[in-house]
């Protein structure tokens, strides 16, 4: 007797967000184990899982039946399966129509929509009860879809379930609609039931105790083997066999999805390839005015040949058109990534770095014929003007042929723990406490940390919360839009993949993310935003206005000694790429003295080189402490620039090619295998080939294995050399601007917020340390952006000195429109009073409160915070007509200062500082630590400045506000902490044991005291932490009131993820309150993490 056969046609993956509880890979692996022949993936109103399901089906040898569950109006649900490519296109268009109609995250479709787009679709009705409504729907189904109409039979595990199936089967037979068995799978194994209950509760925003019948009523929605399905549906053998029948009828496969890039007609009468070649050769003299080097010419011919064979010319023309448009609108942009390996991209001006100077010209790192993947060019634009470029792409290529990729937002450790805790009914303060102990996105909280928090791990709900949170990590939560990854198509894009509206206006996204489109081989062009480009563009504009000289990234003064002297001292706060604490600790040791040193600096502080044990050998050789030896001349040619240490991906590929006889494509496969060896295990075959090849070419076997170990260590994290050079160019330009024009640099970076590693408070403090005068926000002198004001003084060179005037953008809660109204209203004359500003600018009182809390009335109107707030409360909507007429005749305003004077108690100095931080994000008054210094000195806690001056080996204790916690990706797990007090900054190093011992303090404290040993290595000074103390409570004594205001934090703190709030957003705020004298004012430090 033959084994029972069955195809499961109703499988919901976790891409039905907060419904399914298993991934595609888990489902297809289980299907293979159970002997199921095919799986029909039918997520709700979505094809989001299809690329992953396609990949999983190929990996496990189980056939994929592409489908979708449609929830129509009138509570009607059907399963649909496209039989061919044309039907698939219609299904994509149908979903796009519903998503456009429903708005973000929703899909609204009717029966008429289904009928209109239903040609070629098999439609399976999902019916619950055999009632009159079901009979009507069956008749309509049969009339519309004839032999493509079916009805599903599924167990609901309720009383009279068999009777329900019998009645449904009889009703379908009477209507001439065949039935098919489905199991309505939500998870692959029974053990996943609890997680499915949890995501259901998250979806309904309720606890597990409140869920009731919103949970599945039974635990039967797991995948079952064919034998079990035949046992359960023994009375319906035909319905079981029809599962295979439908699978056979649905012949469409994702491999039929032929993507065609739009044909670019840049030059009429020429093909895309001819146009590209013509444009490239015409652009050569501009890039190489002294003639094209033979090596570069050979590479250019090779690249054009490869592009021609792979038919990628149109792609290069599109990217070129986008870059040319940006430059025509004076938008600063620069290509990066592996595209910087391409001479074509350099010649056309897409990238700024000549790959002939900075790489081994391994074009296959960018485009490989054997890899079968399309190229991927990343171009960075000013983050504040990138939207102009995005809208130009939509307008040029058409909204039916252009869309952004989506990003699948997945659960991270902290979010998973928080949501699971809420579902299980754990107290909110407990879940906050637990989640605050999670460092990385994939990290959980272990039993040890729970015990340190004095919690009982024997508590069933607490233990269950950890188990379920670990299962939830990595599960899709919702779709969001890619930062700028565009997919363009020759034909309608919505016939390839469903399109939905993005959260932002005038944008649309496809349902698939960047990994999905790699599977189906769509080409993507990345229009990315880089804050430092906005900063540099603003800086160049200010510099041109001052000096008349025009600067850009490609024309910076080369190898400026003063700039590199500043870099060597690690005076790089605010610059690009070399501003992190890990980078700053490396700079005085590596001592970059020319541009290529900066390229190495950018690349070396990366997890790969650290894990590959390449940093210390390079530093020793650079300092002359270790000889630079090469086994063979081939290695010297490849590694000479990096002193015999492989730091870049191109070097790894060139070693394989020149020393082990790899082809260019094999070398690229080696690089890709290194990037995934932990998961795939394909690295072993390349190890044998590399070692054997090197030995055959005369290398010692031990040496060959050592080289492989180094390459293996940095494969997944190593920079392409030309990519590092692209970043180094911006790093150098930002450092040059900071070195020679610190006032312009400070202004530009403040006007480009949010961006960078540090908060405005640290940027302003650093500028003041460099002699820049910074002036407060002022209602009569501040524009929206920060500006430069002449001081009437001269610098050492006899040039005019300028002060930075903080702009209205710094005032939290003040909208852009209200700021513009204020600036426009004072064009003729300055404001004379609060009342004058209110009446002339026409802004609401809430905007005035924002200004008063930011102390913006003090500089010109001499009104302190409390006086200004009191004046705002005294404002009248309209004066009486008689007094108004008199005021007009007198050309005067009705001043609030004519009210009876009230003696308001002035705020304390500490209270003013707290208010500054709370409403401007920084203070130009005393540092908060100044008010605590006397108490700290009594405890023999020294200042940060004193700590960094003492001799090596000194034991001491210092304290400060926590600016940054950084955990570079190294095997040793060292953690950097940066503390700030009124005298400066101190850097602490925590080894793993210390971190684990004081984990709660490290992750939670806003102010810490650190006792440890000073370690000096040249100009690098670290405090190696031995003991940490949480001093956050001390900050409560700085002010007078109990309202907690956050001390602004840098985006560089790795513990906190995401972007800081845009303080320009309009927010509802309470009316100004009375400031009671006995209230306690407090600073609350919230730091953030940055990997």
From Swiss-Prot:
One of its GO terms (molecular function) is nucleic acid binding. The lineage of its organism: Bacteria, Pseudomonadati, Pseudomonadota, Alphaproteobacteria, Hyphomicrobiales. GO terms for cellular component: cytoplasm. DNA polymerase involved in damage-induced mutagenesis and translesion synthesis (TLS). It is not the major replicative DNA polymerase. Residues 1051-1064 have a biased composition (Basic and acidic residues). Pfam families: DNA_pol3_alpha, DNA_pol3_finger, HHH_6, PHP, tRNA_anti-codon. It comes from Agrobacterium fabrum (strain C58 / ATCC 33970). It catalyses: DNA(n) + a 2'-deoxyribonucleoside 5'-triphosphate = DNA(n+1) + diphosphate. Its EC number is 2.7.7.7. Keywords: Cytoplasm, DNA damage, DNA repair, DNA replication, DNA-directed DNA polymerase, Nucleotidyltransferase, Transferase. Belongs to the DNA polymerase type-C family. DnaE2 subfamily. Residues 1051-1080 are annotated as: Disordered. The gene is dnaE2-1. One of its GO terms (biological process) is SOS response. It is an enzyme of class 2 (transferase). This is Error-prone DNA polymerase 1. It is found in: Cytoplasm. The keyword Transcription regulation does not apply.
């Amino acid at each position: 007797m033959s084994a029972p056969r069955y195809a499961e046609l109703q499988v919901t993956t976790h891409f039905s967000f907060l419904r399914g509880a298993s991934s595609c890979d888990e489902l297809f692996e289980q299907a293979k184990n159970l002997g199921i022949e095919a799986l029909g993936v039918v997520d709700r109103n979505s094809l989001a899982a299809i690329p992953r399901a396609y990949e999983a089906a190929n990996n496990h040898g189980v056939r994929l039946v592409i489908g979708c569950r449609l929830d129509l109006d009138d509570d009607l649900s059907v399963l649909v399966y496209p039989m061919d490519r044309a039907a698939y296109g219609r299904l994509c268009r149908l979903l796009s129509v519903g998503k456009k109609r429903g708005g973000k995250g929703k899909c609204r479709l009717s029966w008429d929509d289904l009928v209109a787009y239903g040609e070629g679709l098999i439609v399976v009705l999902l019916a619950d009860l055999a009632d009159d409504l079901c009979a009507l729907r069956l008749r309509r189904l049969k009339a519309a879809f004839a032999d493509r109409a079916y009805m599903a039979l599924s167990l609901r595990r309720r009383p009279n379930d068999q009777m329900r199936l019998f009645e449904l089967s009889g009703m379908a037979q009477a209507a001439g609609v065949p039935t098919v068995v489905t199991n309505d799978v939500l998870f692959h194994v029974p053990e996943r039931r609890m997680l499915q209950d949890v995501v259901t509760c998250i979806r309904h925003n309720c606890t597990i105790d409140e869920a009731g019948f919103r949970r599945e009523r039974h635990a039967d929605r797991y995948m079952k083997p064919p034998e079990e399905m035949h046992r359960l549906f023994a009375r319906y053998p035909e319905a079981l066999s029809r599962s295979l029948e439908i699978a056979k009828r649905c012949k469409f496969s994702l491999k039929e999805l032929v993507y065609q890039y739009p044909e670019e007609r840049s030059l009429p009468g020429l093909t895309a390839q001819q146009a590209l070649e013509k444009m490239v050769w015409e652009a050569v003299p501009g890039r190489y005015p002294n003639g094209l080097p033979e090596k570069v010419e050979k590479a250019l011919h090779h690249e054009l040949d490869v592009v021609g064979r792979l038919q990628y010319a149109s792609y290069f023309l599109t990217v070129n058109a986008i870059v040319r448009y940006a430059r025509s609108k004076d938008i600063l942009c620069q290509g990066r990534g592996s595209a910087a390996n391409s001479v074509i991209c350099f010649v056309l001006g897409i990238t700024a770095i000549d790959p002939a100077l900075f790489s081994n010209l391994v074009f296959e790192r960018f485009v490989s014929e054997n890899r079968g993947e399309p190229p991927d060019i990343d171009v960075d634009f000013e983050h504040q003007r990138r939207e102009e470029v995005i809208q130009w792409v939509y307008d040029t290529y058409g909204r039916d042929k252009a869309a952004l990729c989506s990003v699948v937002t997945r659960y991270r450790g902290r979010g998973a723990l928080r949501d699971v805790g809420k579902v299980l009914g754990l107290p909110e303060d407990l879940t906050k406490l637990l989640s605050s102990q999670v460092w990385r996105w994939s990290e959980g909280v272990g039993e040890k940390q729970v015990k340190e928090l004095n919690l009982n791990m024997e508590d069933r709900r607490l233990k269950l919360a950890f188990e379920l949170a670990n299962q939830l990590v990595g599960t899709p939560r919702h779709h969001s839009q890619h930062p700028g990854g565009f997919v363009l198509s020759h034909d309608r894009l919505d016939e390839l993949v469903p399109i939905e509206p993005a959260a932002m206006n005038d944008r649309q996204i496809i349902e698939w993310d960047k990994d999905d489109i790699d599977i189906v081989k769509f080409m993507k062009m990345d229009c990315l935003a880089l804050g430092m480009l906005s900063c540099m563009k603003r800086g160049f504009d200010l510099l041109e206005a001052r000096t008349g000289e025009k600067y850009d990234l490609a024309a910076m003064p080369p190898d400026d000694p003063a700039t590199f002297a500043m870099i060597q001292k690690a005076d790089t706060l605010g610059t690009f790429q070399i501003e992190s604490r890990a980078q700053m600790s490396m700079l005085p040791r590596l001592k970059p003295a020319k541009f290529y040193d900066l390229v190495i600096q950018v690349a070396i502080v990366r997890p790969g080189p650290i894990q590959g044990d390449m940093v210390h050998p390079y530093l020793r050789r650079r300092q002359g402490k270790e000889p630079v030896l090469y086994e063979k001349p081939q290695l010297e040619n490849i590694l000479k620039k990096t002193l015999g240490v492989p730091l870049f991906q191109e070097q790894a590929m060139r070693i394989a090619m020149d020393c082990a006889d790899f082809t260019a494509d094999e070398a690229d496969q080696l690089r890709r295998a290194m990037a995934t060896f932990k998961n795939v295990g394909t690295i072993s075959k390349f190890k044998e080939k590399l070692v054997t090849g090197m030995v055959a070419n005369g290398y010692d076997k031990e040496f060959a294995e050592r080289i492989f170990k180094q390459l293996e260590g940095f494969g997944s994290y190593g920079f392409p050399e030309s990519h590092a050079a692209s970043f180094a160019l911006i790093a150098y330009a930002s450092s040059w601007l900071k070195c020679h024009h610190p006032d312009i640099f400070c202004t530009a970076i403040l006007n480009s917020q949010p961006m960078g590693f540090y908060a405005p408070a640290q940027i302003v403090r650093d500028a003041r340390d460099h002699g820049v005068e910074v002036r407060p926000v002022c209602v009569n002198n501040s524009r929206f952006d920060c500006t430069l004001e002449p001081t009437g003084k001269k610098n050492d060179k006899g040039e005019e000195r300028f002060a930075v005037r903080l702009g209205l953008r710094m005032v939290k809660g003040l909208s852009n429109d209200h700021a513009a109204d204020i600036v426009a209203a004072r064009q003729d004359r300055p404001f004379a009073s609060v009342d004058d500003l209110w009446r002339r600018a026409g802004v609401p009182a809430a905007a005035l409160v924002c200004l008063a809390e930011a102390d913006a009335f003090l500089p010109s109107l001499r009104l302190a915070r409390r006086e200004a707030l009191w004046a705002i409360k005294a404002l009248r909507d309209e004066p009486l007509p008689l007094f108004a007429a008199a005021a007009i005749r007198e050309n005067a305003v009705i001043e609030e200062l004519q009210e009876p004077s009230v003696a308001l108690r002035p705020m304390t100095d500490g209270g003013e500082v707290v208010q500054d931080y709370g409403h401007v994000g920084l203070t130009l008054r005393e540092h908060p630590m100044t008010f605590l210094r006397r108490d700290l000195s009594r405890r023999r806690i020294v200042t940060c400045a004193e700590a960094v001056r003492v001799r090596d080996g000194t034991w001491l204790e210092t304290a400060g506000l926590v600016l940054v916690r950084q955990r570079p990706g190294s095997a040793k797990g060292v953690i950097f902490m940066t503390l700030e007090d009124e005298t400066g900054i101190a850097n602490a190093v925590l080894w793993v044991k210390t971190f684990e011992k004081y984990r709660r303090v490290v992750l939670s404290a806003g102010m810490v005291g650190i006792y440890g040993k000073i370690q000096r290595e040249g100009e690098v000074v670290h405090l190696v932490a031995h003991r940490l103390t949480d001093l956050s409570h001390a900050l409560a004594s700085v002010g007078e009131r109990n309202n907690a205001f956050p001390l602004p934090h840098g985006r560089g703190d790795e513990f906190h993820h995401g972007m800081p709030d845009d303080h320009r957003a309009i927010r509802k705020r309470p009316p100004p309150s009375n400031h009671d004298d006995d209230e306690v004012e407090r600073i609350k430090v919230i730091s953030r993490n940055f990997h």
